[in-house]
């Protein structure tokens, strides 16, 4: 305790000496030489220092009073009190050293942790920057891919439209050709029908002519000439053949069916060659 009082008194004396040095009168000549601004700053600074010194003196006086009251209350011997104070001061000093060492250890640990944290923060910042750059690159690639996809879709759509248009043109051309071909086929079939009808008519005429010739040669007592027989055999049998009848019945039927032809045949016969049955 005594050492603490001594230190407090020494500090108080130092403070008083500083106050005395600050409060020394300054000569009128020096004051006249100093500029007004510096004087104002000096006065303000002096007032601040005065307030600080007064507060320090009050604290020192308060501590001295507390120490004196403690010594009076305990009623200890001054020598024993001095030894006790010395031991307490030594213990406090040792404790202070331990606290200081612990503080330094903690400070070192904090520094190490702070260094690691700063390193980790820098690494995290670097990774964050890399991730941001990668994300930006990914966004750019995505945008490019979307643009390419849109371009491909547009191109495909245009190709499909052109293809559909071409198919429509080809289909229209095919339909037109089909219509023309169908019309041509209809004309051909119609012409073929007409030709068939004409052929039927010509065949009927030829059949009548052959029948007439056969009747004529029968009436004359001669057979058909070989060329007529061969031609008659080569004729197609499109119509059902009538059953064979006697010559008289056939002649009568023929004359009955075509009186004009019979009369013509009779008129063309020579009179001397007619052989009646």
Swiss-Prot record:
Renumbered to this chain, region (Interaction with NDC80 and ZW10) spans 80-155
Mind naming one GO cellular-component term on file for this protein? Knl1/Spc105 complex
Q: Where in the cell is it found?
A: Nucleus; Chromosome, Centromere, Kinetochore
Return the Polar residues bias intervals: 241-253
Q: Which InterPro entries match?
A: Zwint-1
According to its UniProt entry, what is the function of this protein?
Acts as a component of the outer kinetochore KNL1 complex that serves as a docking point for spindle assembly checkpoint components and mediates microtubule-kinetochore interactions. Kinetochores, consisting of a centromere-associated inner segment and a microtubule-contacting outer segment, play a crucial role in chromosome segregation by mediating the physical connection between centromeric DNA and spindle microtubules.
Q: What is this protein called?
A: Outer kinetochore KNL1 complex subunit ZWINT
Give the organism, scientific name. Homo sapiens (Human)
- Source taxonomy: Eukaryota, Metazoa, Chordata, Craniata, Vertebrata
Instruction: Name the gene that codes for it.
Output: ZWINT
């Amino acid at each position: 305790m005594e050492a603490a009082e001594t230190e407090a008194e020494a500090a108080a004396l130092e403070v008083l000496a500083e106050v005395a040095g600050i409060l020394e009168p300054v000569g009128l000549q020096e004051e006249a030489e100093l500029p007004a601004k510096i004087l104002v700053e000096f006065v303000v600074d002096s007032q601040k220092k005065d307030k600080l010194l007064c507060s320090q003196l009050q604290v020192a006086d308060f501590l001295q009073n507390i120490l004196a009251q403690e010594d009076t209350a305990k009623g200890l011997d001054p020598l024993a009190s001095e030894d006790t104070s010395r031991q307490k001061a030594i213990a406090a000093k040792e404790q202070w050293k331990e606290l200081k060492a612990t503080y330094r250890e903690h400070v070192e640990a904090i520094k190490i942790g702070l260094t690691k944290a700063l390193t980790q923060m820098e690494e995290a910042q670097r990774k964050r920057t890399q991730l941001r750059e990668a994300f930006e690159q990914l966004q750019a690639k995505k945008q490019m891919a979307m643009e390419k996809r849109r371009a491909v879709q547009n191109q495909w759509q245009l190709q499909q439209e052109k293809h559909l248009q071409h198919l429509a043109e080809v289909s229209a051309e095919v339909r037109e050709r089909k219509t023309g071909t169908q019309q041509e086929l209809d004309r051909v079939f119609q012409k073929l029908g007409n030709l068939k009808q004409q052929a039927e008519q010509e065949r009927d005429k030829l059949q009548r002519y052959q029948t007439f010739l056969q009747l004529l040669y029968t009436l004359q007592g001669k057979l058909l000439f070989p060329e007529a027989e061969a031609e008659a055999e080569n004729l197609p049998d499109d119509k059902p053949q009538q059953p064979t009848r006697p010559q008289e019945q056939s002649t009568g039927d023929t004359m009955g069916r075509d009186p004009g032809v019979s009369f013509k045949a009779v008129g063309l016969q020579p009179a001397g060659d007619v052989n009646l049955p």
